[in-house]
Amino acid sequence: MRGQGRKESLSDSRDLDGSYDQLTGHPPGPTKKALKQRFLKLLPCCGPQALPSVSETLAVPASLRPHRPRPLDPDSVEDEFELSTVCHRPEGLEQLQEQTKFTRKELQVLYRGFKNECPSGIVNEENFKQIYSQFFPQGDSSTYATFLFNAFDTNHDGSVSFEDFVAGLSVILRGTIDDRLNWAFNLYDLNKDGCITKEEMLDIMKSIYDMMGKYTYPALREEAPREHVESFFQKMDRNKDGVVTIEEFIESCQKDENIMRSMQLFDNVI
């Protein structure tokens, strides 16, 4: 990862043949360290000021960089959960510990960062897209950010609270393989009807290519998103009925070594 300067393109680690991860459409092959740095870069509340073990040279836009917190005082942070005057009051630490796979201290760090970025206690879709766009200045990330926002907004109220945020993060980072695959399926199932259609997957692929932008190597061909969708369905649509169910999705992913490796890259990100 480039420590300073412009953000790396999603195509930086692409193989010379231009192949992609079958599940996500992203270039294959990032190391766990590289993925950790990229993931932390996408989560301002997990930036270098919040997690001292991450290099201080980690590039985070100044507008998104969280304030350097004072040394964590467990009692004072817990008081913030109970007495916060923000618009949305989060649930208590103990309850969030029971609902997620984060420790008390991890929740404290995540909450302080989330509150720095979202003083009101929630983030709406437009703010989410604005934050996300700053990590992909070479492309248009707005559509993909909308899909990602909807995956975090599980109760579909148009906002992501701290509870929503850590619930999704807990699945992505600490969930079982099945948990993570279910979360990914929900991301791709845009209308939440229990199956993925070619139209939905094409929308996802186009949004990923849009986010990557035109400054990629090798240059992307116009038909690339549709070709990726066809490849996806050839692998995932086991009964060839034109849709991919959650059962087909999980079964196909579990048989794909590349996908399984990509799932394991999220282990111990924070």
UniProtKB/Swiss-Prot annotation:
Q: Where is this region: Interaction with KCND2?
A: 257-270
- In its UniProt record, which GO terms are filed under biological process? regulation of potassium ion transmembrane transport
Recorded GO molecular functions are: calcium ion binding; potassium channel activity; potassium channel regulator activity
Give me the residues that bind Ca(2+) 2, please.
D189, N191, D193, C195, E200
Positions with an attached lipid (S-palmitoyl cysteine) read C45, C46
- Cite the entry's keywords alphabetically: Calcium, Cell membrane, Ion channel, Ion transport, Lipoprotein, Membrane, Metal-binding, Palmitate, Phosphoprotein, Potassium, Potassium channel, Potassium transport, Repeat, Transport, Voltage-gated channel
Topology class, membrane: Lipid-anchor
Gene3D superfamilies cross-referenced by the UniProt entry: EF-hand
User: What InterPro entries does its record include?
Assistant: EF-hand-dom_pair, EF_Hand_1_Ca_BS, EF_hand_dom, Recoverin
Q: Which domain of life is it from?
A: Eukaryota
- As stated in the Swiss-Prot or TrEMBL entry, residues carrying the post-translational modification Phosphoserine are S9
Q: Name one GO cellular component term.
A: voltage-gated potassium channel complex
Matching entries from Pfam families are given as: EF-hand_7, EF-hand_8
| Cellular location(s) | Cell membrane
State the SUPFAM superfamilies in the record.
EF-hand
What range(s) does the EF-hand domain occupy? 81-137, 140-175, 176-211, 224-259
Biased amino acid composition, Basic and acidic residues = 1-17
Q: In which tissues is it expressed?
A: Expressed in heart ventricle with isoform 1 as most prominent form.
UniProt function note: Regulatory subunit of Kv4/D (Shal)-type voltage-gated rapidly inactivating A-type potassium channels. Modulates channel density, inactivation kinetics and rate of recovery from inactivation in a calcium-dependent and isoform-specific manner. Involved in KCND2 and KCND3 trafficking to the cell surface. May be required for the expression of I(To) currents in the heart.
Q: Whom does it interact with, and what assembly results? A: Component of heteromultimeric potassium channels. Identified in potassium channel complexes containing KCND1, KCND2, KCND3, KCNIP1, KCNIP2, KCNIP3, KCNIP4, DPP6 and DPP10. The KCND2-KCNIP2 channel complex contains four KCND2 and four KCNIP2 subunits. Interacts with KCND2. Probably part of a complex consisting of KCNIP1, KCNIP2 isoform 3 and KCND2. At least isoform 2 and isoform 3 can self-associate to form homodimers and homotetramers. Isoform 3 interacts with KCNIP1 in a calcium-dependent manner.
Q: Which family is it part of?
A: Belongs to the recoverin family.
Q: Any idea what this protein is called?
A: A-type potassium channel modulatory protein KCNIP2
Q: Which species?
A: Mustela putorius furo (European domestic ferret)
Q: What is the lineage of its organism?
A: Eukaryota, Metazoa, Chordata, Craniata, Vertebrata
